[in-house]
């Protein structure tokens, strides 16, 4: 299934794509795509519904983040060896974990706000993993059983705040609009191998990032097992699993960063695309 949330920010309704790619409304069956709705049992109930029997959503509504009420938005850094090299950092021996504030979450096509005074706002196309069941201390072999589905994430980052101003990375990762998620939550059964997905990103039509999740340092299963050893993962938590090379700060001889008035387009194989316009923060 391809699940989504549509409508004005803060008033999103749950939906599903039918066989023709049209949005059907699910709000008579579930209040949101969150919590127990994301469990195997909850998704099985949705799967039993014939989308053709659901109300058709007219027009072209805004698409919101594909998960509601996210509890934890967990980032993984330097998870592609070639990205670590372009960043001038060693390949990590353990996952680099940071937090993205849930207030950064927005829809896949919402605008990206360039923070006041920022000259180092950067892009990162990533595979997002949505947890569907509570897990603690899970084995790598069973880790994917706890996944509800997958989505596209743009881990927008302000490099000065992330790297140059001391402290943790979180500061540069959590500005408002720095967490576009979606358009769809593609359920686990439709993604047979999360380690075989192409991902890409373009700025104003120029392709900067081309990668595949097979080159991750730590696989999705390894990340879930690792994270569950130091925290309890809960339904609706989102893990964004790192980016391939081609980010702005790694461009030689001179880095390239986002500025207002640009168009960012990105996607992950089978999970849809995002399209964002950049603007100065108000």
Curated annotation (Swiss-Prot):
GO terms for biological process: urate catabolic process. It comes from the Bacteria. Keywords: Hydrolase, Magnesium, Metal-binding. The keyword Magnesium applies. Its cofactor is Mg(2+). GO terms for molecular function: hydrolase activity; metal ion binding; ureidoglycolate lyase activity. Signal peptide: none annotated. PANTHER family: FUMARYLACETOACETATE HYDROLASE DOMAIN-CONTAINING PROTEIN 2A, FUMARYLACETOACETATE HYDROLASE DOMAIN-CONTAINING PROTEIN 2A-RELATED. This is Putative hydrolase Bcep18194_B0137. The lineage of its organism: Bacteria, Pseudomonadati, Pseudomonadota, Betaproteobacteria, Burkholderiales.
